[in-house]
Structures are given as C-alpha cells and as structure tokens.
C-alpha cells in the first residue's frame, strides 16, 4: 500500500492541534523517515506501530524538539516549534526518575523548586494515585508506581500534547492495562492530544482513535486505521478483531519483505 500524502484528524474531532511535516530525515546517507504529513486534534490519541527500525521513536523525537536536523516543520496550535517546549510532555519506556529526589520533586523538576509543597504537583500525584508517596524516593516504588510518577511528570505544566514511547512495555500485563486506562482518563480530563508509539497491537487498538502503520526503509505511513469503537472500550470487543488482523497482515508483509521471502512463514498456524 502506498504512503498516504496527508494523514488527517479523525472525522468529527476538532481542528488539528499538531501539524507535522517530515519531507526527509537522514542518519548519515540513510533516509530514516520520508514524506510524512500528520495532523492530530486536541483530545485525540494516535498510536504509531511498525517493525523495529522504521523510525517510530525518531518521529517522536522530532515532535518533541529533540532532533531538529530534518527537512520539514512541526507546528503546534499554529505556532512553529523549533526545540523542546513546555507545551509538549514526554513519557519514555523507563520512568527515568532521579533517584536522589523525592517523587514530588521528580514530578515538579521543571519548576526548579525543591522540598516545598507545590499544589499543582500534589494535584497531579493525587490524579495518578500517588498522593501517599510524595516524599518517598523512587527506589521505594514498584515499576507500575514509578511509571505513574512519570505520567504525572509528563503532565506537569499542563502540556497540550503528550508523547509516549512504549510507556508500558516494562510492566506486567495487569499493571499495563491499568496504566492504559489511566492514560485515557488523563488525556480526556486535560483535553490534550497524545501520540503513543507501541509494539503492542492490542494496546494500539485499545488506546487509539487512529492507528498509523509505519513501513520501513525509509519510514513512511503505509496504512491508517480509524478505530471506530465507542469508549469505554471492551478489550474483548469482536469488532477490534478485523482491525487487529489487518495490522498483523501488514507486519507479516514487512517481515517477509525484509527477509527476502515473499511467501514467508505464517504468523498463525492452520
């Protein structure tokens, strides 16, 4: 399937908050991303999936202002972004909490204040269920609690856009599902937009209003799925099965092409 020239917000959602244009992104002589045009509306969650090495994390770094060396533009609410911005929150695969600071000081790190009581930090910790551990150090938290602290830190300063790079891949299945539901709650409550990079197809279909499939060599949008399933979603909803099969077929195609085997070995058994 050929790349889409422009990926628009889901029908019925407000005008775009984010307008991303990547004509080309190079690493040395290799083209990592090419011909990407993506718009995301406020209140919308877009999930990005694709095989390893297709440029998913690079795309997030560009939007976050951490990788300015590309041909194109990033516009947020009509204003060009040329570097990191308080209007864009980032949540990584690992919590990356500073071990010598309390949970509260980690969440409010960008403010520069330490040791005091910040009402906005206290509100965020309460929102993610960590009000009782504000003065504890990161080493005392479970993996799921640490990632909730990272979500609170990403929300500090009331960003308009939240970027998440495989945020729940390092926790167990039940914790992952709880964190996914927490993410949906905070995106809805704060009326922000979110882009989630994930390798988990079920996670993408549960979280996303849209799912973008990136093809590799170079990274480009190969397919877009509108997830027209009402929220709150049931993870067992059979209407998600056909969309999941479509994503699996795309992954099989990419892997077979990379291996030089057009027939390939089926992912599912007969």
UniProtKB/Swiss-Prot annotation:
EC number in record: 7.6.2.14
Matches recorded under SMART domains: AAA
Origin species: Burkholderia cenocepacia (strain HI2424)
Gene that encodes the chain: ssuB2
Binding residue positions for ATP: 50-57
One annotated GO molecular function: ATP binding
The protein's name: Aliphatic sulfonates import ATP-binding protein SsuB 2
Reactions performed catalytically: ATP + H2O + aliphatic sulfonate-[sulfonate-binding protein]Side 1 = ADP + phosphate + aliphatic sulfonateSide 2 + [sulfonate-binding protein]Side 1
Membrane topology reported for the UniProt record: Peripheral membrane protein
Keyword annotations of the record: ATP-binding, Cell inner membrane, Cell membrane, Membrane, Nucleotide-binding, Translocase, Transport
CDD domains named among the record's database cross-references: ABC_NrtD_SsuB_transporters
Disulfide bonds listed in the record: none
Chain ranges of the ABC transporter domain: 17-241
Record function comment: Part of the ABC transporter complex SsuABC involved in aliphatic sulfonates import. Responsible for energy coupling to the transport system.
Subunit details: The complex is composed of two ATP-binding proteins (SsuB), two transmembrane proteins (SsuC) and a solute-binding protein (SsuA).
InterPro entries on file: AAA+_ATPase, ABC_transporter-like_ATP-bd, ABC_transporter-like_CS, ABC_transporter_ATP-bind, P-loop_NTPase
Similarity section: Belongs to the ABC transporter superfamily. Aliphatic sulfonates importer (TC 3.A.1.17.2) family.
Gene Ontology CC annotation, any one: plasma membrane
């Amino acid at each position: 399937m050929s790349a889409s020239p422009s990926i628009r917000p889901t029908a019925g959602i407000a005008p775009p908050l984010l307008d991303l244009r990547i004509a080309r992104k190079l690493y040395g002589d290799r083209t990592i991303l090419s011909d990407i045009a993506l718009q995301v509306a406020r209140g919308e969650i877009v999930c990005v999936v694709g095989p390893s090495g297709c440029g998913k994390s690079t795309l997030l770094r560009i939007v976050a202002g951490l990788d300015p060396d590309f041909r194109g533009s990033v516009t947020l609410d009509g204003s060009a972004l040329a570097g990191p911005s308080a209007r864009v929150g980032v949540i990584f695969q690992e919590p990356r909490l500073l071990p010598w600071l309390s949970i509260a000081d980690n969440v409010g790190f960008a403010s520069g204040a330490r040791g005091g009581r910040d009402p906005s930090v206290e509100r965020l910790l309460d929102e993610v269920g960590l009000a009782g551990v504000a003065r504890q150090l990161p080493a005392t938290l479970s993996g799921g609690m640490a990632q909730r602290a990272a979500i609170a830190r990403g929300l500090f300063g009331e960003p308009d856009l939240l970027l998440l790079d495989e945020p729940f891949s390092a926790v167990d299945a039940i914790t992952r599902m709880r964190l996914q539901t927490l993410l949906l709650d905070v995106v809805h409550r704060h009326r922000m937009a979110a882009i989630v990079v994930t390798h988990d197809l079920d996670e993408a279909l549960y979280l996303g209003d849209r799912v973008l499939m990136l093809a590799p060599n170079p990274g480009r949008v190969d397919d877009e799925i509108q997830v027209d399933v009402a929220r709150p979603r049931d993870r067992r909803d059979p209407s998600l099965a056909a969309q999941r099969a479509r994503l699996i077929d795309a992954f099989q195609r990419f892997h077979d092409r990379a291996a030089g085997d057009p027939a390939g070995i089926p992912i599912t058994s007969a």
